[in-house]
Amino acid sequence: MESIGIVAPQTMHFAEPLRLQSGSVIGNYQLVVETYGELNAARSNAVLVCHALNASHHVAGVYADDPRSTGWWDNMVGPGKPLDTNRFFVIGVNNLGSCFGSTGPMSIDPSTGKPYGAKFPVVTVEDWVHAQARVADAFGIERFAAVMGGSLGGMQALAWSLMYPERVAHCIDIASTPKLSAQNIAFNEVARSAILSDPDFHGGDYYAHGVKPKRGLRVARMIGHITYLSDDDMAEKFGRALRRADGALDAYNFSFDVEFEVESYLRYQGDKFADYFDANTYLLITRALDYFDPAKAFDGNLTAALAHTQAKYLIASFSTDWRFAPARSREIVKALLDNKRTVSYAEIDAPHGHDAFLLDDARYHNLIRAYYERIANEVGA
């Protein structure tokens, strides 16, 4: 299927201050967005796609000046694809605190004339949803046909159905969780510690020093990436294969240089990530992950937390995802069923772990395609 082709982001400016869950206020902020497809006359065919930790507004298509800049969910969104832009108007929003153009730690603090750095206020999933609602308002969209996301994006989709129940017809929540486990919070803490202990971090003010805490950011990404892959997938891709600079494939070099293919892969992923991502943003987003827990205000009762939702739901998980295991998705399903909500659930047998939600798997894509066909029939798309 064809890509949506050349796309261009747009920057939306908001003068009305946004009060955050922490009590801090952000004024005069901007959000970078991309849109695909056409909004129909009734404004009933809009779909919001929420991004995960290291992604952005650039969901699909390519930029004219960089043919390699394919959107992070290009296999999912586009003409004739599961989320068909011939039928739906799709919006991608770069969240507050990110490093791809929306107001965040790299932005200039008007009170100092310098980047916010670590002084940028902590944000939450709920803060992002409120900011996204203002984007919807700017487009004149009163109700989304669907809000969709995977991983952290799925948390935002779920939060939308809780916070703006009358504005979400369908919630599509993929490879996600109603809250992080202690183990997941621990992974995030180790990743943050790697960044905070990097001498180049400078208390978050590394911009003024002309450096980036790349060593810490690289380790943080390596830790995260391990959790995104399944044991079987890593065994299939790498096993215990050696990668020696001298070409030898069957002998150790008895040093601490890279020897195994999996080591080489993780270092490559870490280096690539450290080149384009911002360390302060990584700290912010992982903390937003930690804080997400809609049942907290209901004494941990997820059924009570979801009692006032109105959307219909598609919840999907992957068999080998151990970061956000299928059991976590089933918690959401049970709470929704307890509230007699309309829920479709699928656990897809896929070998690729948590990252499976980003990949082109026929069973997975057929599921999403069929669900959007149902939505299209409802809204006349």
From Swiss-Prot:
Any Gene Ontology CC annotation: cytoplasm
Catalytic activity, EC: 2.3.1.46
Active site residues of this protein: S151, D321, H354
Any one GO BP annotation for this protein: homoserine metabolic process
Residue span, AB hydrolase-1 domain: 45-360
Alphabetized SUPFAM superfamilies for the sequence: alpha/beta-Hydrolases
Annotated keywords: Acyltransferase, Amino-acid biosynthesis, Cytoplasm, Methionine biosynthesis, Transferase
Listed GO MF terms: homoserine O-acetyltransferase activity; homoserine O-succinyltransferase activity
Name recorded for this polypeptide: Homoserine O-succinyltransferase
